[in-house]
């Protein structure tokens, strides 16, 4: 069975979206692309699939929120941008998913969530 056939038969599909998919070269969110992505995910969910969206983009959305043009090199500054951008990104996802009758939720994971059995089990149950 090739990859396309496995995908057609999959009960659960994980979609990983990178920053360049969500943000235009200008640094502004690409609302049209986000809407198409969410519509496809909602259609698959309505067809009975379990859907998980893994999304990057919080730093870029945070940069746009405060008008910053260049990504800082310092980790604390990136963390601050991610904190700003994450809530904005989730607000966008919640709005787009609501347009298609779906509820968006957020689960924040770290490497430790996969490495430690009890954390892995809790994360899996949350999903």
Model-predicted segments: where are they?
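Nucleotide/pyrophosphate-binding catalytic subdomain
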Residues: 1-127
């Amino acid at each position: 069975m090739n990859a396309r056939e496995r995908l057609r038969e999959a009960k659960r599909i994980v979609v990983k979206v990178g920053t360049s998919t969500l943000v235009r070269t200008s640094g502004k969110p690409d609302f049209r692309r986000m809407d198409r992505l969410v519509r496809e995910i909602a259609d698959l969910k309505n067809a009975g699939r379990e859907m998980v969206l893994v999304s990057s983009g919080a730093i870029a959305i945070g940069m746009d929120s405060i008008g910053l043009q260049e990504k800082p090199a310092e980790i604390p500054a990136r963390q601050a941008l991610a904190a700003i951008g994450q809530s904005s990104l989730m607000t966008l996802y919640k709005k787009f998913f609501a347009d298609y009758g779906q509820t968006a939720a957020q689960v924040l994971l770290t490497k430790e969530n996969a490495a430690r059995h009890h954390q892995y089990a809790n994360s899996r149950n949350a999903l």
